[in-house]
From Swiss-Prot:
One annotated GO molecular function: asparagine-tRNA ligase activity
Species per Swiss-Prot/TrEMBL record: Saccharomyces cerevisiae (strain ATCC 204508 / S288c)
GO terms for cellular component: cytoplasm; cytosol
Catalytic activity: tRNA(Asn) + L-asparagine + ATP = L-asparaginyl-tRNA(Asn) + AMP + diphosphate + H(+)
Annotated SUPFAM superfamilies: Class II aaRS and biotin synthetases, Nucleic acid-binding proteins
Keyword Ligase among UniProt keywords: yes
CDD domains: AsnRS_cyto_like_N (cd04323), AsxRS_core (cd00776)
Main location: cytoplasm
Entry-linked Pfam families: AsnRS_N, tRNA-synt_2, tRNA_anti-codon
Protein name according to UniProt: Asparagine--tRNA ligase, cytoplasmic
Keyword vocabulary terms for this entry: Aminoacyl-tRNA synthetase, ATP-binding, Cytoplasm, Ligase, Nucleotide-binding, Protein biosynthesis
UniProt cross-references to PANTHER family, sorted A to Z: ASPARAGINE--TRNA LIGASE, CYTOPLASMIC, ASPARTYL/LYSYL-TRNA SYNTHETASE
Entries under Gene3D superfamilies matching the protein: asparaginyl-tRNA synthetase, N-terminal domain (3.30.1910.20), Bira Bifunctional Protein, Domain 2 (3.30.930.10), Nucleic acid-binding proteins (2.40.50.140)
Name of the gene this protein is made from: DED81
InterPro entries recorded: Aa-tRNA-synt_II (IPR004364), aa-tRNA-synth_II (IPR006195), aa-tRNA-synth_II/BPL/LPL (IPR045864), Asn-tRNA-ligase (IPR004522), AsnRS_N (IPR048952), Asp/Asn-tRNA-synth_IIb (IPR002312), NA-bd_OB-fold (IPR012340), NA-bd_OB_tRNA (IPR004365)
Length: 554
């Protein structure tokens, strides 16, 4: 009978361990297990090192019983490991055979099939039973035994595509990655009842070509814009983030909104003009101007095209523009951008009530046309399921009555005090009031002191102006407008009050000199109205490449 030695402090549990006093095992169970693995017929004597006596002593009966039980467990574990290793080897052999088989599969187009009709995805939905070819980016990719499912995206829509047979087994198919570009050939089939996919159809692929293979592994698309990434990192990767479902949907709704706004303006007989973006005048105050050197002279990026639009009234009638405006505001709120798409209009020979009705018509009809759009309408429902289209007439609420309402509802100003006439209603209080009332509001007749110098005073109360902010529940202000001063003396007094040198504004002042008229206008931030339509937390999600303080890339 052999003897084996165990020393917990310095022993090693390995099959190569000698089990001598110089090279002992760590545990009794492993000593028995190692002995049996070497086919020893008889159980060895076990000697365990006792630290307190500083010598090896024969193992006790109870400890030996425990060691035998532990040895049985090690044997079962060893058998299981061998089985797993065998399965692993078999799997590797199968995979190697599959890979070899996959490498031998050549993807060829069957020339006996009808010629494929080149089509965009959105148009393919109506081509059931026809063989088509569509090109795009792999938006989703999953495998199911011997079938590969691909959701293809081309900007016009999405289509589910099915690859089966040799196409699904080919190595070229197994190497496909998200965002790879491909051209797929196949037959459009209608989905059976109970199944859903974009357009209610799918493409049974019979042949395809790889146009550009996107990287996998660490450089894969999903690693670049991982869900939950820091917003600043996602903004750095904006060019990739735009491929996502939500952002691309917002951009499509944006396009439909601008198209709808132009449609309403056409119906209302407004003419589109394109005023300059480089100017030497200000509209909204000098502190938010982006200054630049213009051939040795000081110039600015436009804050608003209002002044130029006013000059067009005498020649073109009612006019509008849709172009970028710039505000150098070091504001990091979710409602501000340094560059935004500004919808602006000026209208002649109208009253303040006429102006309000015009703004009402523009908003109601534009939203209606977006919701009726076959692409944008479903996207709004997808992004904002609870959206309710606004209906005319909007609630009219004068500034003085809003002050009363805020105080009655114990909503304080920024100093924590009750509101008083002349206070500027800050965003937080305005939002709380709007959300509580719960309907679109025309907030009107603001005090002269808190509005721009060019706004016309009310004839029945010269303390206030014929001005309006349009407030929407859950968003706040989306539009601001007013009647403009049409009297030259009153306008000059406004310039003087603001300390503005009138020399650079001669062309604007001339509008009152050479045939003045009652007129008014407004500006709408496209990104704000989109945030309302699409239920976005920040206007940054509503701009293609948002620009704000600290962000001017990519």
């Amino acid at each position: 009978m052999s003897s084996l030695y165990i020393k917990e402090a310095t022993g090693v549990d390995e099959l190569t361990t000698a089990g001598s006093q110089d090279h002992p095992f760590k545990t009794p169970a492993y000593a028995l297990f190692a002995s049996q693995q070497k086919s020893d017929a008889t159980e060895p004597k076990l000697f365990v090192f006792k630290t307190e006596d500083n010598e090896y002593q024969e193992i006790s009966a109870s400890a030996l019983k425990k060691a035998r039980k532990g040895c049985d467990g090690l044997k079962k574990k060893a058998v299981k490991q061998k089985e797993q290793e065998l399965k692993k080897q078999q799997k590797e052999a199968e995979n190697a055979a599959k890979q070899l088989s996959a490498l031998n599969i050549t993807i060829k187009e069957d020339e006996s099939l009808p010629a494929a009709i080149k089509t965009r995805i959105y148009d393919s939905y109506s081509k059931v039973g026809q063989r088509v070819k569509v090109s795009g980016w792999i938006h989703r990719l999953r495998s199911n035994k011997k079938v590969i499912f691909v959701v293809l995206r081309d900007g016009s829509g999405f289509i589910q595509c099915v690859l089966s047979g040799d196409l699904a087994l080919a190595q070229q198919t197994l190497d496909l990655t998200l965002e790879s570009t491909v051209t797929l050939y196949g037959t459009i089939v209608k989905l059976p009842e109970g199944k859903t996919a974009p357009g209610g159809v799918e493409l049974n692929v019979d042949y395809y070509e790889v146009v550009g293979l996107a990287p996998g592994g660490e450089d894969s698309f999903t690693n670049k814009i991982a869900e939950g990434s820091d917003p600043s990192l996602l903004l750095d990767q904006r060019h990739l983030a735009l491929r996502g479902d939500a952002l691309s949907a917002v951009m499509k709704v944006r396009a439909a909104l601008l198209k709808s706004v132009r449609r309403v303006y056409d119906e209302e007989h407004l003419t589109e003009v394109t005023p300059p973006c480089m100017v030497q005048t200000q509209v909204e105050g000098g502190s938010t101007l982006f200054k630049m050197n213009y051939y040795g002279e000081e110039a600015y990026l436009t804050q608003s095209s209002q002044l130029y639009l006013e000059t067009c009234l005498a020649s073109l009638g009612d006019v509008y523009t849709i172009q970028e405006s710039f505000r150098a505001e070091k504001s990091h709120t979710r409602r501000h951008l340094s560059e935004y798409t500004h919808i602006e209009a000026e209208l002649a020979f109208l009253t303040f009530d006429d102006l309000l009705q015009h703004i009402e018509t523009l908003i109601v009809k534009s939203v209606q046309y977006v919701l009726e759009d076959p692409i944008a309408g479903p996207l709004v429902k997808q992004l904002n399921p609870n959206f309710k289209a606004p209906k005319a007439p909007f609630m009219r609420l004068q500034y003085k009555d809003a002050i009363t309402w805020l105080n009655e509802h114990d909503i304080k100003n920024e100093e924590g005090e009750d509101f008083k006439f002349g206070d500027d209603i800050a965003e937080a209080a305005e939002r709380k009031m709007t959300d509580t009332i719960g309907v679109p509001i025309f907030l009107t007749r603001f005090p002269v002191e808190i509005k721009s110098f060019y706004m016309k005073r009310c004839s029945d109360d010269p303390r206030v102006t014929e001005s309006v902010d349009v407030l929407m529940p859950n968003v706040g202000e989306i539009t601001g407008g007013s009647m403009r001063i049409d009297d030259m003396d009153e306008l000059m007094a406004g310039f003087k009050r603001e300390g503005i040198d009138t020399d650079a504004y001669y062309w604007f002042i001339d509008q009152r000199k050479y045939g003045t008229c009652p007129h008014g206008g407004y500006g709408i931030g496209t990104e704000r109205i989109l945030a309302w339509l699409c239920d976005r937390f920040t206007v940054r999600d509503c701009s293609l490449y948002p620009r704000f303080s600290g962000r001017c890339k990519p």
